[in-house]
Curated annotation (Swiss-Prot):
<feature type="region of interest" description="Disordered">
    <location>
        <begin position="353"/>
        <end position="376"/>
    </location>
</feature>
<protein>
    <recommendedName>
        <fullName>Cobalt-precorrin-5B C(1)-methyltransferase</fullName>
        <ecNumber>2.1.1.195</ecNumber>
    </recommendedName>
</protein>
<dbReference type="GO" id="GO:0019251">
    <property type="term" value="P:anaerobic cobalamin biosynthetic process"/>
</dbReference>
<keyword id="KW-0169">Cobalamin biosynthesis</keyword>
<dbReference type="InterPro" id="IPR002748">
    <property type="entry name" value="CbiD"/>
</dbReference>
<keyword id="KW-0949">S-adenosyl-L-methionine</keyword>
<comment type="pathway">
    <text>Cofactor biosynthesis; adenosylcobalamin biosynthesis; cob(II)yrinate a,c-diamide from sirohydrochlorin (anaerobic route): step 6/10.</text>
</comment>
<feature type="compositionally biased region" description="Polar residues">
    <location>
        <begin position="355"/>
        <end position="366"/>
    </location>
</feature>
<keyword id="KW-0489">Methyltransferase</keyword>
<dbReference type="Pfam" id="PF01888">
    <property type="entry name" value="CbiD"/>
</dbReference>
<comment type="similarity">
    <text>Belongs to the CbiD family.</text>
</comment>
<dbReference type="GO" id="GO:0043780">
    <property type="term" value="F:cobalt-precorrin-5B C1-methyltransferase activity"/>
</dbReference>
<dbReference type="InterPro" id="IPR036074">
    <property type="entry name" value="CbiD_sf"/>
</dbReference>
<dbReference type="GO" id="GO:0032259">
    <property type="term" value="P:methylation"/>
</dbReference>
<keyword id="KW-0808">Transferase</keyword>
Length: 376
């Protein structure tokens, strides 16, 4: 992968690091020696090798640690020490997992593992099991305890608390590899948030583009925390998942700029995907009753927030029109009349600037405003 002419390095997931640490600890428990380096098998069949950052051998256990290298991805767990402590299990117990310090415990239903389990996801578990069997053979009986140094603090920068994963981070990974600046991890967290909301009985979820819109939307509807989905820029990712994992009602809440992009037909509202089209916004202002002077001023505005201020100063409700057009885009992506949909548009201070009523979504004709959405 390249950006600005620079090739970006891929990295390794916490699951891969945990598997490598476990294999080394298991080998040391059986032979008295830590392998160096230690290789593990990824789901793809590739076999990366890792150096050990920590080694410890006790009477009934062995512990090894691997420092996570996320490559050039701005991962909050980059540089974290992932350690595995391996002990012999009871005969016939198989491979069991425990959460050590810094690894979370699942407390809510709806996640891939039931409440009470350590937050070591299914693919990392399979990788760890494979790693153990490579050194101990089939029918191995071991207890594996994964810990992460400063995992409790790292977890504060993740969505674990929202998902009901308490006490630390999750051990994650589906491929074993971290792709720099991939949106995959965020989209998967959106999906898990919807799963938890459904499993805890939420019939109305609110997807927000940021903290301000989430808090403001919460003030409107007084929803439980499990109903709040931090969708960020990935509106389409949330709506597409809701097609096959429906709830009765979904609210999309966002700031004026991101909701203007949604109104223009963009389902990924990150700045890298395109800018809000002030020309199209001027057309909307005219549809709302604005005169030519307002249209000219909006075309010359510094940003969308400025355009909203200009419209408001002359009594034009631009927020209502943007909310309506954003609803059209979102309803087309949702593709089901079974889910009621509404839009909330907020300014940077959290003041409500536009909203739609909760209306069963359908597949309407494309908006003319949405056809003007590719100015960069």
């Amino acid at each position: 992968m390249e950006t600005d002419g620079k090739t970006l390095r891929r990295g390794w997931t916490t699951g891969t690091c945990a598997a490598a640490a476990t294999k080394a600890a298991c080998a040391a428990l059986l032979t008295g020696e830590f392998p160096y380096p230690v290789d593990v098998e990824l789901p793809s069949g590739a076999r990366p090798a890792f150096s050990l950052a920590t080694e410890e051998k006790g009477e009934n256990f062995a512990r090894a640690g691997v420092v996570k290298d996320a490559g050039d991805d701005p991962d909050v767990t980059h540089g974290a020490l992932i350690e595995s402590t391996v002990r012999r299990g009871e005969p016939g117990s198989g491979i069991t997992f425990r959460a050590g310090k810094g690894v979370g415990i699942i407390t809510r239903p709806g996640l891939p593992l039931p409440p009470g389990e350590p937050a070591i996801n299914p693919v990392p578990r399979r990788m760890i099991e494979t790693a153990i069997r490579e050194v101990a053979g089939e029918n191995a009986d071991f207890e594996v305890e994964i810990s992460v140094r400063d995992g409790e603090k790292l977890a504060e920068k993740t969505l674990n608390g929202r998902l009901g994963i308490l006490g630390g981070i999750s051990i994650l990974g589906t491929t074993g590899v971290v792709i720099p600046f991939s949106c995959s991890a965020w989209i998967h967290s959106i999906w898990r948030g919807i799963d938890v909301a459904r499993a805890t009985g939420c019939t109305h979820v609110l997807g927000a583009t940021g903290n301000t819109s989430e808090k403001a939307g919460q003030a409107v509807y007084d929803l439980p925390e499990t109903a709040l989905i931090d969708m960020g820029d990935f509106i389409g990712g949330m709506l597409k998942y809701l097609r096959s994992h429906p709830v009765e009602r979904v609210t999309i809440a966002g700031g004026v700029a991101k909701m203007t992009k949604l109104a223009q037909g963009m389902l990924d509202v990150h700045s890298k995907k395109g800018l809000a089209d002030l020309e199209a916004l001027a057309v909307l202002a005219a549809e709302a009753g604005g005169d030519d002077n307002l249209a000219v001023a909006i075309r010359q505005a510094n940003m969308v927030a400025h355009a909203f201020q200009l419209a408001e100063s002359v009594g034009i409700d631009l927020g209502a029109v943007v909310a309506e057009k954003a609803w059209v885009t979102a309803a087309a992506a949702l593709k089901t009349p079974a889910i009621a949909l509404d839009i909330l548009v907020f300014d940077r201070q959290g003041a409500l600037k536009g909203r739609t009523t909760s209306t069963p979504s359908h597949q309407p004709a494309p908006s003319s405003f949405g056809d003007r959405n590719r100015r960069t």
